[in-house]
Amino acid sequence: MPTINQLIRIERKAVLKRKKTPALQACPQRRGVCTRVYTTTPKKPNSALRKVARVRLTNGIEVTAYIPGEGHNLQEHSVVIIRGGRVKDLPGVRYHIVRGTLDTSGVADRRKSRSKYGAKRPK
């Protein structure tokens, strides 16, 4: 416990909160170019081949981003937009690719939650 005099001399340090999406630098989304598109396996109780992409952002930072939805058209040099949002069973994946923008197509034959996957309204 510090004395009053010690607190006057040196004030208390505020506890700094760690940012969940540092690469976005306080922007809602960021544009980037895919440098590698691949699949990876999730953490222990789960089993799958999750589609992810390594993306170099316009601010020069390179991050791993998840490709949501079934099927995608991404390859190396595709221009994408990423948003925040981690994938719980993929360590190190803290970003999602936005479907239906730039070079990313929307999910085909999607009927529910269409706006989240960039799918047009079915006729």
From Swiss-Prot:
The keyword Cell inner membrane does not apply. The modification 3-methylthioaspartic acid is found at D89. It holds the Pfam family Ribosom_S12_S23. InterPro entries: NA-bd_OB-fold (IPR012340), Ribosomal_uS12 (IPR006032), Ribosomal_uS12_bac (IPR005679). GO terms for biological process: translation. One of its GO terms (cellular component) is small ribosomal subunit. Signal peptide: none annotated. Keywords: Methylation, Ribonucleoprotein, Ribosomal protein, RNA-binding, rRNA-binding, tRNA-binding. CDD domains: Ribosomal_S12 (cd03368). GO terms for molecular function: rRNA binding; structural constituent of ribosome; tRNA binding. The keyword RNA-binding applies. It comes from the Bacteria. With S4 and S5 plays an important role in translational accuracy. Belongs to the universal ribosomal protein uS12 family. Part of the 30S ribosomal subunit. Contacts proteins S8 and S17. May interact with IF1 in the 30S initiation complex. This is Small ribosomal subunit protein uS12. The gene is rpsL.
